[in-house]
Structures are given as structure tokens and as C-alpha cells.
């Protein structure tokens, strides 16, 4: 932290270092992340298109998957294009204004929190479908789905308001180089000339509340699902259900594990380079894996993809 001096000028622009230690491999990493980004866009757009066009998928589960796909597109698009511009040295690709930096962090936090709550809602949907199939229509009606989705987006939007407001009250007189590929809270706090103790505490509590609340719903839901599956007599059906749950839990564990590591910590002095690697997992890798695990492995979605992208489907429209 630097001492306050009245004639210092407030920083109006930041420079993002990105992955500064890999200059020789910038083109390789550009191609890698561009491929992953485009793959994520194609996957999620395909799911949105298929669910929207195939009436057989007009069910609550696919309603939530559509919301998740929309969210993943926006989630990756907040940070990845700027990161790609920095890799290839586009003019101003590493520069970002103070206002744009706060906006990027707000949107990214909003979408990340919303995804946590959406994953919890989807886990609850699967819990009711598997553990209480006879009551599924009563507990997961279309009205309930709409209210759950709206609540996820609303609470997600409210989540970053206080943290970003507190961040906007901090002073930044320089240096203005962010040791990250996006405007993340920890490297920003490391640059502030103000006392960041209160800001760190609020970030910790907000992150902990979001992650614990949503992960507890997921843990309880899947715990009950596993208990129910253990009582299925057919070994083939039990194995099929277990493999699906294991795939879901793998992605959820990766997403939540990286988020817990990144945001439920109170010191900005943690390894920035390791944080950047962890950030790649929840901002690039997980959004690419989610459609594969939640949707594209699903036989109904595969069948719908075949129908939607067949000539007969479009001739009948």
C-alpha cells in the first residue's frame, strides 16, 4: 500500500498483464483459448436452438439448461475476447478503463453467482424427478420453474452490488498494471492505496454466503439422489444413473472447487500466477464442459439435434 499524497492523480486506465511469462507461446495459447471459446459458443447456441425448436424438449429440465447455456455464453464473453486480444497484441488489447474494469468485474461476478444458483435449481429439479417422481408435476410446475429462474438471476444480480460499490470507493494512484487476464478483485486490491481490510471482509462473506448456500442445496439434492439410486434393483439402470450423476458432480466439483479456492480467501498476497491458472478453469474450461455433461450426453438432446439439423425438419416448417 502506498501513502496518500494529495497531488497524485487517480488512475483512469489499467493495463492487464495476462500470461506475461509465456511470450514465446502467445500464438499457441491464442489458438487454444480461441478454439475453446468458439467450441463453447457453438455448443451452447446449439442447445438453445434445439430446445427452442423441438417441442419434445419443452420440459422443466431443458428450461433450466437453456438458461445455463445463455449464461455460459455471456460468462465467457465477458473476459475471453479481451484475453485473446492481449495474446495477439491488438492495439489497446491489454488496456481497460477504470469504469470498464469495474463493469467487467460486476458482470462477471453477477453471472458467476447466477450460475451457482442455477446449478442449485437444476440439482433440486433432478432430486424431485428421481426421488419423488409422482409429485414432480406439483413441485416443479412451469410457474415454479419461472420463479426459480427469476430468483437465480435476481439474487445473482444483487450479489456484486455492495462489493463493487466498496471497490469504487478505493483510491488507485498507481501502479496501474493488473497481474491478471481480467479485472479480478484480488489483483485490483493489491494495487489500491486505500485500506482494503473492510473490502476483503465483505468479499469473503459474500462469496462464502453464495457458495455455501448453493453448494448445500446441490449436496443435499445429490445425496438424496444417490441414496435413492442405491435402492434401484436393476444393476444396469443403477449404473446408468450413477454415471450421469458422477458426470454432473465432476463438473460441479470443478466449478465450486476453483471458486472456493479463489474467492473464499482473505489475503491478496496469494500466488497470482496460480490464481490465474485456477481462473481459467472456472471462466473457460467449465463453461466448455457444462454443455457436454448436462446436455450433449443426453439421448433426448442427441435425438433432437439429429431432428433439428435434418433436412426433413426444415422442410416441414
Swiss-Prot record:
It is found in: Cell membrane. Residues 49-56, 125-143, 222-241, 297-317 are cytoplasmic. The chain crosses the membrane at residues 28-48, 57-77, 104-124, 144-164, 202-221, 242-262, 276-296. One of its GO terms (cellular component) is plasma membrane. Residues 1-27, 78-103, 165-201, 263-275 are extracellular. It is a multi-pass membrane protein. One of its GO terms (biological process) is detection of chemical stimulus involved in sensory perception of smell. InterPro entries: GPCR_Rhodpsn, GPCR_Rhodpsn_7TM, Olfact_rcpt, Olfactory_GPCR1. One of its GO terms (molecular function) is G protein-coupled receptor activity. The keyword Ribonucleoprotein does not apply. Disulfide bonds join 101-193. Pfam families: 7tm_4. Glycans are attached at residues 7, 95. Keywords: Cell membrane, Disulfide bond, G-protein coupled receptor, Glycoprotein, Membrane, Olfaction, Receptor, Sensory transduction, Transducer, Transmembrane, Transmembrane helix. The keyword Transferase does not apply. Its main location: membrane. Belongs to the G-protein coupled receptor 1 family. Odorant receptor. This is Olfactory receptor 6Q1.
Amino acid at each position: 500500500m502506498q501513502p496518500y499524497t494529495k497531488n497524485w492523480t487517480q488512475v483512469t486506465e489499467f493495463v492487464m498483464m495476462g500470461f506475461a511469462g509465456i511470450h514465446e507461446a502467445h500464438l499457441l495459447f491464442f489458438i487454444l483459448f480461441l478454439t475453446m471459446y468458439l467450441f463453447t459458443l457453438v455448443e451452447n447456441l446449439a442447445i438453445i436452438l434445439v430446445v427452442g425448436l423441438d417441442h419434445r424438449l419443452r420440459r422443466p429440465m431443458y428450461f433450466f439448461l437453456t438458461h445455463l447455456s445463455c449464461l455460459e455464453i455471456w460468462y465467457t464473453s465477458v473476459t475471453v475476447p479481451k484475453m485473446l486480444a492481449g495474446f495477439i497484441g491488438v492495439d489497446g488489447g491489454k488496456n481497460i478503463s477504470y469504469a470498464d474494469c469495474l463493469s467487467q468485474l460486476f458482470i462477471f461476478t453477477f453471472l458467476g453467482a447466477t450460475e451457482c444458483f442455477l446449478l442449485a435449481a437444476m440439482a433440486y429439479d433432478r432430486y424431485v424427478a428421481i426421488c419423488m417422481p409422482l409429485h414432480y408435476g406439483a413441485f416443479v410446475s412451469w410457474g415454479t420453474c419461472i420463479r426459480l429462474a427469476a430468483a437465480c438471476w435476481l439474487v445473482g444480480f444483487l450479489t456484486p452490488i455492495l462489493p463493487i460499490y466498496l471497490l469504487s470507493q478505493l483510491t488507485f494512484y498507481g501502479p496501474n498494471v493488473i497481474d491478471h487476464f481480467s479485472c479480478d478483485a484480488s489483483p485490483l486490491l493489491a494495487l489500491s492505496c486505500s485500506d482494503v481490510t473492510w473490502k476483503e471482509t465483505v468479499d469473503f462473506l459474500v462469496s462464502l454466503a453464495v457458495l455455501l448456500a448453493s453448494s448445500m442445496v446441490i449436496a443435499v439434492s445429490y445425496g438424496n439422489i444417490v441414496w435413492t439410486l442405491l435402492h434401484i434393483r436393476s444393476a444396469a439402470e443403477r449404473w446408468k444413473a450413477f454415471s450421469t450423476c458422477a458426470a454432473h458432480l465432476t463438473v460441479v466439483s470443478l466449478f465450486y472447487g476453483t471458486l472456493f479456492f479463489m474467492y473464499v480467501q482473505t489475503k491478496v498476497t496469494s500466488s497470482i500466477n496460480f490464481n490465474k491458472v485456477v481462473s481459467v478453469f472456472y471462466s473457460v474450461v467449465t463453461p466448455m464442459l457444462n454443455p457436454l455433461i448436462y446436455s450433449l450426453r443426453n439421448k433426448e438432446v442427441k435425438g433432437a439435434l439429429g431432428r433439428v439439423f435434418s433436412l426433413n425438419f426444415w422442410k416441414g416448417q
